[in-house]
């Protein structure tokens, strides 16, 4: 592990620089400005020797008269190049953050569904916001400070060597000890930084869950529990931050001690070796001034190390995410709408190499017909609906669309043929019109209104203050459950896809609304292949075929009346919902 760390750091730097490369002209200008800034500082230190020697030892009136002009020009130029360097480096950093955030977001959007099953929204937000921001500190603040201070250190050491190389060599003997201290804190800070990122993800996750589920939190009296949980996470985060601070303190104090020993050694050497080393008062004071000036950049470089390590840990987290494989998306691009014939052939499926959820599932949905999936929770209904648009890849078997295996179609082409209305409605913090037209951004206002009318949403939309331009709030919080569901149905109607997936599409509606929506859906379903998932069997009586699932296997198929005549699983489920009676032997 120890040997791999420098190699890993170099690889991270190299990969990070690939994002900086497009902005190299501005970066180069910023680097040159910072080098000039450090050169001016080192030049002022060398001028100390001339000021003393030519102003007090051997007086040079011409030089003395030039001192105010030298100081004015030097300080003015120093301020200008400092501002230029800071602006250029910040511009590069924010540009890198923008590109990296866009890349991370685009990658997350295209990750397979099983990744979302394991990762929380808080963890993902932490990567986009916190981890990428740590990378910004490496590519701007840290880089600026590093260039300025390393150039200043080199400049000051050069000044010392020019003035008196013998004393300067003595000081250089302290460098290996500084390296030992920095190397130790490098590893410690990187390790702690990974913990800091993890705790930030936990803090974001806890806050996100509590805010989104505030109704449940309040009705079940969970405020104190959530506050305690959040406080524990923030306290753990604080402790990790303090560990980083301790590492910084050890770094700074250790380096300052080494430099102090170096300065003391040089002063003693200058006193005891005065007969061997000839040096003027101005030169001696200039060397001492240079050594004292070295303390600040050396201190900055050592504290900078913690920032760099946090940034590298952030980069590692971001790049690990970017290395995750995307959804497999190689296949044919369909230019026309399909007819909509669906066939499942010997389909098996397991999540993440676990036990099979589906076992040898076989059925056909003729184009333009409706098929309903029924069964107890966990029987595999939603899994079947998720396999069709390839949210998950099959473990075994084949699903065909108009005779073509869905794996041979591009994801965009495949999903373009489908509309979805699920039990958990997703609305965006945008206008009602834009929510209905989601995925059909070229739709006219007339088309949007027509879809809303078919979904029985037009009436309540017109009663809102801004009508179709009313913003719905985060996830449609300003709408009732039934209203949100009708907007989702209007969205599916507007897409006008040949395949319609209804996952408990009427579950959030009251009886009156459900009656209207059911009538609207029957009209929309005409000529479309429709896959219906429902718990309320009264809503699927008119489906062309009903498939009964139990423990991931198909146990019955047929029309509503045919299944009732069988007096099997479906008949028992129907009796339970209609009359509250059940034959336990049949359902088990």
Swiss-Prot record:
The chain crosses the membrane at residues 23-43, 56-76, 141-161, 162-182, 257-277, 278-298. Disulfide bonds: none annotated. It is found in: Cell inner membrane. CDD domains: ABC_6TM_MsbA_like (cd18552). PROSITE patterns: ABC_TM1F, ABC_TRANSPORTER_1, ABC_TRANSPORTER_2, MSBA. It catalyses: ATP + H2O + lipid A-core oligosaccharideSide 1 = ADP + phosphate + lipid A-core oligosaccharideSide 2. Its main location: membrane. Keywords: ATP-binding, Cell inner membrane, Cell membrane, Lipid transport, Membrane, Nucleotide-binding, Translocase, Transmembrane, Transmembrane helix, Transport. The keyword Disulfide bond does not apply. Residues 28-310 form the ABC transmembrane type-1 domain. GO terms for molecular function: ABC-type oligopeptide transporter activity; ATP binding; ATP hydrolysis activity; ATPase-coupled lipid transmembrane transporter activity. It is an enzyme of class 7 (translocase). It is a multi-pass membrane protein. It comes from the Bacteria. Pfam families: ABC_membrane, ABC_tran. Residues 342-576 form the ABC transporter domain. Its EC number is 7.5.2.6. GO terms for cellular component: plasma membrane. ATP binds at residues 375-382. SMART domains: AAA (SM00382). Belongs to the ABC transporter superfamily. Lipid exporter (TC 3.A.1.106) family. Involved in lipopolysaccharide (LPS) biosynthesis. Translocates lipid A-core from the inner to the outer leaflet of the inner membrane. Transmembrane domains (TMD) form a pore in the inner membrane and the ATP-binding domain (NBD) is responsible for energy generation. Homodimer. In MsbA the ATP-binding domain (NBD) and the transmembrane domain (TMD) are fused. This is ATP-dependent lipid A-core flippase. The lineage of its organism: Bacteria, Pseudomonadati, Pseudomonadota, Gammaproteobacteria, Legionellales. The gene is msbA.
């Amino acid at each position: 592990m120890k040997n791999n760390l420098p190699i890993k750091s170099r690889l991270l730097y190299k990969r990070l620089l690939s994002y900086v490369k497009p902005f190299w002209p501005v970066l180069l200008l910023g680097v040159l400005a910072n080098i000039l800034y450090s050169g001016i500082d080192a030049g002022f230190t060398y001028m100390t020797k001339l000021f003393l020697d030519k102003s007090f030892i051997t007086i040079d009136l011409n030089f003395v008269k030039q001192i105010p002009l030298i100081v004015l020009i030097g300080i003015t130029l120093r301020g200008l190049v400092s501002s230029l360097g800071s602006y250029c480096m910040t511009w590069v950093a924010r540009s890198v953050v923008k590109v990296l955030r866009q890349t991370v977001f685009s990658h997350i959007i295209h990750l397979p569904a099983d990744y979302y099953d394991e990762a929380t929204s808080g963890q993902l937000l932490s990567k986009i916001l916190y981890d990428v921001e740590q990378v910004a500190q490496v590519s701007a603040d840290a880089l600026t400070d590093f260039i300025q201070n390393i150039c200043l250190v080199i400049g000051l050491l050069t000044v010392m060597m020019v003035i008196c190389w013998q004393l300067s060599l003595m000081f250089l003997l302290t460098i290996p000890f500084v390296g030992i201290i920095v190397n130790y804190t490098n590893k410690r800070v990187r390790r702690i930084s990974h913990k800091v990122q993890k705790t930030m993800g936990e803090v974001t996750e806890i806050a996100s869950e509590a805010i989104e589920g505030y109704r449940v939190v309040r009705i079940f009296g969970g405020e104190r529990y959530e506050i305690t949980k959040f406080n524990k996470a923030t306290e753990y985060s604080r402790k990790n931050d303090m560990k980083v601070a301790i590492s910084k303190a050890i770094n700074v104090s250790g380096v300052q001690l080494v430099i102090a020993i170096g300065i003391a050694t040089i002063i003693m050497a200058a006193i005891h070796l005065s007969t061997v080393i000839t040096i003027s008062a101005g030169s001696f004071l200039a060397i001492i001034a240079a050594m004292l000036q070295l303390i600040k950049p050396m201190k900055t470089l050592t504290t900078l190390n913690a920032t760099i390590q946090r940034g590298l840990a952030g980069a590692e987290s971001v790049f690990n995410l970017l290395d995750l494989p995307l959804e497999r998306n190689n296949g044919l691009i369909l230019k026309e709408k399909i007819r909509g014939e669906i066939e499942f052939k010997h389909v098996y499926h397991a999540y993440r190499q676990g036990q099979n959820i589906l076992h040898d599932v076989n059925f056909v949905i003729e184009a333009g017909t409706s098929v309903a999936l029924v069964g107890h929770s966990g029987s595999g209904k939603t899994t079947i609906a998720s396999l069709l648009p390839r949210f998950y890849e099959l473990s075994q078997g084949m699903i065909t669309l108009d005779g073509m295996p869905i794996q041979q179609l591009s994801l965009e082409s495949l999903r373009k043929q489908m509309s979805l209305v699920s039990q958990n409605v997703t609305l965006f913090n945008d206008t009602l019109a834009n929510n209905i037209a989601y995925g059909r951004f070229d739709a006219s206002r007339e088309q949007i209104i027509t879809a809303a009318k078919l979904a029985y949403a037009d009436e309540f939309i017109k009663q809102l203050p801004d009508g179709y331009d009313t913003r719905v709030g985060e996830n449609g919080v300003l709408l009732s459950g039934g209203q949100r569901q009708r907007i989702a149905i209007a969205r599916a109607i507007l897409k006008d896809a040949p395949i319609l997936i209804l996952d408990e599409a009427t579950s959030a509606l009251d009886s009156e609304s459900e009656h209207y929506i059911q009538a609207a859906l029957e009209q929309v379903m005409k000529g479309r292949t429709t896959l219906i998932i429902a718990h309320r069997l009264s809503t699927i009586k008119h489906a062309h075929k009903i498939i009964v699932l139990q423990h991931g296997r198909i146990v019955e198929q047929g029309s509503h009346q045919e299944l009732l005549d069988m007096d099997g699983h479906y008949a028992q489920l129907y009796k339970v919902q209609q009359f509250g009676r059940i034959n336990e032997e049949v359902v088990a």
